[in-house]
């Protein structure tokens, strides 16, 4: 009876259970994400690559060949673009910057290349008979104008002429720094025993010309614009440029000349301030002008030292022989040292006493301030500049500081050991004006300094000179390929391409680096276009540079770098395009895939990824899994191509025109023969079956062409209902003539036979399915009713248990309350009982 009641009320329980099951399935189902490829994302990685140069075509004299070979550089961009990267923080390290090493190697190569065609002075390594030049002292001049005795030597020597077996005597003037005494009157050139001396070609100019280092296509240069950036650590004001500012390759020691200035206060930079072996680079905020001159009016003469070789030396000095010197403002310099001392105190402690002392010794290039002025190499005594403390100031009492300078013509190449250069003398007087924009300092070591820090001028490693200008730059490699999870899955359908919004074109290269991934996705076309346009522009620049120097029939260092940059850019672009092609994403900025996103790569939600993260942060998070994702995309694309190939193999039936291809006629003939053979065999089988059937009925076959009675069904016997009645008229099958007629009859019989058998089979299957369905539905209803019955029983049992528990609890509660009431009444009656007892006692 109860089971019947449950069966009647199962409908609303069924609906409720279905709804609950659906809600559970929706809540438990995790949304599937798929890998999507993006091309042109604003992502970069630190890299080292070959940089090429750009220079202003009007910055040098076309009549002379500057040693920097800037004629081989591409022209500078008249409108350079610098794009500020919002919300981007990047780490810089000026002490581990490959741009510095690359510039250093370039300068070495340029000097070597400029000296290759020049004359080797090996024949000049002979004994020199030298005497001091007359009028080498001038008592009427001031102390700094008086040239020291023996500063210029008049030397005679025997030299081979254009005829090798003929020797003649020649004389020349040499500076004292360029000769070494052998005995009292005999000398030799200073570097003959250690180096190969090469004379600089007559028309080579050492005048520094600004060089812009540029990144090839596919790379970018990041620039730190923090005004107080110390060279290492994070920088929050970052922009991207294609080329650096113009850097003058000034070769100098102690003082940095004609560089860039700090925008606000003086900035001091060092790799490690606590290590006194590390150089301190000081960048000034105001330049100090230094004017240098060689007052001597020199003449230059040529000495033939062999076939096709000439030595250029100083012939004579017209007028008084005076000391070369440099002048700078004492007030400006003292103010500069005071500001530097303040910054050094901030770094090393305000309780420290800052002292500047001259160099402690070493090579002339280190002890003095060495630089090139108008083609001559000056070595100026900087003692007056670096004799300073808070109380003593400078010893010089005049308005200007005058530095006495000496000149050398044989220069030890600061780049390499075993090479020296002879700088030919310059005619006439020499004057040059430079701006002091920085200093190179070293700190004295020792533990017991008594609260004093002593700083001395340093230098010698030209990398520090380049580092003082390149500290704000770093080269990065653009990684335009990015992968991220989305809800979209690749479908093998064809859709029209949509045009990218024009608004993206107004954003600069990498301009969306600080934006979220969702916002940056609309600027993909900018990066994609500039990668290719940069390569094309690089190609045009290269061809222009080669055309400009084609008369030389050789490439300079810069020309080789142009080729390297071009090849590198093409290789990177082709590699990216190859990956896109392998993934089936050619020509697409956003490409969906069939690779499911694995939460082990990143378990962040879509909102966290696309609304809160930049592409740079996202790339750092999945960087370890990038190769795995790439391989999975490639495998997925390979599988898809195999599937498409199998599908296309079936597509040959789509075109009826292919059926008439002459190459398939033999196949058609083969099929026709098989069909005819099958029909003939089928005809034979039917004839045999007909004969067997007739024989079983008692007839004998007379002829295959005889009319045979048609078979009747079981519901139509041969006679009438009464016995002995007349037979019904027999039906006979038609006798046909001709091969095609026989084929038609056989095909018709075969089709009818197949139709009847298939119909019977279908009816049987339908009956079976119907029977199974009924029984299955009955079983399901039975189990459902049974489940509802037991659920109701469990519910009733639970209700009964709850009721019994409630009754037991209620009864127990009543008993407890009754006991408490009795106890309370007993307590209340105690005074009454006491009173009654007292009354009884009194009575």
UniProtKB/Swiss-Prot annotation:
CC terms in the record's Gene Ontology section: host cell endosome membrane; host cell plasma membrane; membrane; viral envelope; virion membrane
Stretches assigned to the Extracellular side: 32-671
Motif YXXL motif: where in chain: 699-702
Residue ranges of the motif Di-leucine internalization motif: 842-843
Record topological domains on the Cytoplasmic side: 693-843
Stretches the record annotates as V3: 292-325
Region: Fusion peptide, residue numbers: 499-519
Site positions (Cleavage): 498-499
Signal peptide, first to last residue: 1-31
Region entry V2, spans: 155-192
Protein name: Envelope glycoprotein gp160
Species of provenance: Human immunodeficiency virus type 1 group M subtype B (isolate YU-2) (HIV-1)
Source taxonomy: Viruses, Riboviria, Pararnavirae, Artverviricota, Revtraviricetes
Gene name of this polypeptide: env
